[in-house]
Structures are given as C-alpha cells and as structure tokens.
Regions:
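Surface-exposed amphipathic alpha-helical tracts and adjacent flexible/coil segments at the periphery
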Residues: 2-175
Length: 175
C-alpha cells in the first residue's frame, strides 16, 4: 500500500522477533522482503539511540554519520590520569574498551531463511577492503552450500562472478 518492497530490520532483533515480523507481513496481501544484518558491529548502545558520536564529534550516529568511537582503542585511566592495570599487572593501553566482537550470525543462516529473511546485510562502512572481501567470501560460500542443498532456495546473484582464490576466515578480522 505504501509503495515499499523491503524492510531492513534492526540488527538487535532475535530470530523469534524476525519470525513474528514475517508472520505479520505474510498475513497481508503485499509481499515484502526482509533484509537482516548477518555480520558487523554491534553498537554498545541500542541502534538509533547512540549519542557518543554526536556529543564528541558533532556527527549523528542516528542519521547515518557515526564516527564509530566505540570501535577505537583507548587507554583506561583513573581520576588522576594514571593508567589502570589489568589482572596481569599490565597497563590498559590502546585496547578496545567499548567495542564488542562483531556480530556473526553465520551459524544461523538456515534459521534466518526459515524465519523469512530474503536478503543478508554485511556491514562494510569504515571497514578495509581485506575485511570486506574476506567476510563477503565467507558468507557467499555458506549461502552457496545452503542453496545447493535445498531445491527450494535460489540465489539472486550470479555465482560465476564470485571466484575467490583463498579460504575465507572470519576470525582473522576480529579484534
């Protein structure tokens, strides 16, 4: 009715929530595709509710301009400016203090398809070329295996375009 064909879901949604959204959509007469994140950063805040970037850099994360300050390295200091030591007695220097490990839903692709997801989204913003190539190749490989083993699934892209001469390793790019 409103003229759109696809909904991009929040990355925080569970499979149960995605399934419920799909069930609601299926009860209408208008087919709508669901796009969901499968790999990328998880905000330390809740998507759409982060103000760190705006307060410190005057760049609104809620308007697509996140400076990803939570993905930077930091020193942990006490109130007097002295470095705080970790449990091994080492200074907490230049570590990822606010950054979670990237979301990796690779083990749940089949369940996501069953829940109604038709398009998978991989975060590439502010990522280097090697990271994106590695992660895209990894998911391409997994999706091709799922498609090849299920006669009811088909790829919307041309497989012959994706020729990688390396073995993708998603763990290689995590910090």
């Amino acid at each position: 009715q409103l003229g759109f064909r696809r909904v991009v879901l929040a990355r925080e949604l569970s499979l149960k929530q995605i399934r419920a959204i799909n069930d609601t959509i299926c009860s209408t007469s208008t087919p709508i595709e669901l796009e969901a994140f499968v790999h990328g950063a998880l905000c330390v805040s809740y998507s759409g509710r982060c103000y760190l970037s705006e307060v410190l850099m005057n760049r609104s994360a809620n308007r697509g301009c996140c400076a990803q300050l939570c993905r930077q390295r930091y020193d942990l200091l006490d109130k007097d400016g002295n470095e705080i030591l970790d449990i091994h007695g080492e200074p907490i220097h230049q570590r990822y203090l606010l950054s979670l490990q990237d979301m990796d839903r690779s083990l749940y692709l089949a369940e996501m398809i069953e829940a109604g997801v038709t398009t998978f989204k991989i975060e590439g913003r502010l990522k280097d070329r090697d990271y994106v190539t590695n992660i895209v190749a990894y998911y391409r490989q997994l999706l091709d295996q799922l498609i090849d083993s299920n006669q009811y699934l088909q790829s919307s892209s041309i497989k012959s375009i994706y020729q990688y001469n390396f073995a993708p390793n998603p763990a290689k790019t995590f910090h």
